[in-house]
Amino acid sequence: MPINYDNFYVKPGAATQCHSCPVRSLALFQGVKPEDLEWTQNVREQQYVIKPKRRLLEEGEPPRYSFTLFSGWVAFYQTSVDGNRMISHFALPGDFIGFQAVPGHPMDYSAQALTEVTVCAFPVTQLDEILKNTPELSSRMMTMHAHTMKICRQRMMGIGRKSAKQRLAFLFLELYHRVKFIGELMQGSEENSIVFPLSQEDLADAMGLTSVHISRTLRELTDEGLLSIKHRRLTIYNEPALAEVAHFEKSMVLQDHPLL
């Protein structure tokens, strides 16, 4: 089903200025000099607000826009021939949505808002022209894409080689540390807790498991005193023990940050 762009609402009030953007240090324009930010802002068509469950990209459809995620959570997924969803990645603020090896071709995945999201929208044709003429931005795009693929590979390895308990523990730690990293940059991080809007269905579709299996495994991790999920918050009580279960290291999901 084609994307309904009428579901994209212009962000109320003034659009965020690139020079004061709180996620720019994580995003595509990270390395752009302050004096050059005016032209990057001119590339952006608009800041849009998109409601939960709405799609930003559709598998098999050429996209009109690529996006920088300003706030909220987005799932990248593919749909099997029998209609099942397989989530390959969860995008968080600062992430780029809509990377294509060949710009303008149909997407090989869909992207759906899991929460209300705000995005900076860039027309695909205009952004492609800028990337062709700006090697630094092209390099940054490749770095971001490689990092996303690194996270996806770790998850796929888990699906093929780890138990349900190990897989789920790994996913919790992946998202916990990615969200914490963003929070530290934006001075909004709590000690051992993050906002966690994912449903058991989302977790099942990311892990290749049933919702019943997710519920049982989550209860096991909770009963062992490793974590809890309450009121859309994930709290980790014993990170070393959870990391041992998951065979997890932070370096598996975080990249060196040149501005820190």
Give names to the regions the model predicted.
Residues 1-52, 96-97, 102:
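Cyclic nucleotide-binding regulatory module and flanking cytosolic helices
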Residues 28, 54-116:
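Cyclic nucleotide-binding regulatory domains
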Residues 39-40, 57-60, 188:
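Short loop/turn motifs at secondary-structure junctions and domain boundaries
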Residues 89-154:
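Cyclic-nucleotide recognition modules
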